[in-house]
Amino acid sequence: MSASAKLSRMVCLLCGFFSTGISMASSLILLSASDLAGQWTLQQDEAPAICHLELRDSEVAEASGYDLGGDTACLTRWLPSEPRAWRPTPAGIALLERGGLTLMLLGRQGEGDYRVQKGDGGQLVLRRATP
């Protein structure tokens, strides 16, 4: 392999490495509670049943998170107990029980779009509600 071919190959590899690193780093941005506060919906796949939630930026000390409002009882169809709070994480949004234990971690897929894969192959999707 010629020197110029080796150099060209190395440049391509480095470009791929840096672009992958940049996209991975951008997906691990820790958003603040105030950035995420607002109205959200959670549903399984495209099922008609939708849970309407409100992520609030007021702290819930015993859960080490922020207040979760709306129809939280609706979430018990997928969770072992009703979540009391939430918190932003570098990977997404965690729904928490009263003591702060994470019940579900929804991974960030894009702006206002968070998802988790269920054991049965279904997917839960949390989306920012549009006004």
Curated annotation (Swiss-Prot):
Keyword Disulfide bond recorded: yes
The keyword Signal appears for this protein: yes
Keywords, alphabetical: Disulfide bond, Metalloenzyme inhibitor, Metalloprotease inhibitor, Periplasm, Protease inhibitor, Signal
InterPro entries per the UniProt record, alphabetical: Inh (IPR022815), Inh/Omp19 (IPR021140), Protease_inh_b-brl_dom (IPR016085)
Subcellular location: Periplasm
Signal peptide from the UniProt entry: 1-26
GO molecular function term, any single one: metalloendopeptidase inhibitor activity
GO cellular component, one term: periplasmic space
Disulfide bonds: 51-74
Record function comment: Inhibitor of the alkaline protease. It forms a non-covalent bond with the protease and may prevent its autocatalytic cleavage in the periplasm.
Family: Belongs to the protease inhibitor I38 family.
Protein's name in the database: Proteinase inhibitor
Organism the protein comes from: Pseudomonas aeruginosa (strain ATCC 15692 / DSM 22644 / CIP 104116 / JCM 14847 / LMG 12228 / 1C / PRS 101 / PAO1)
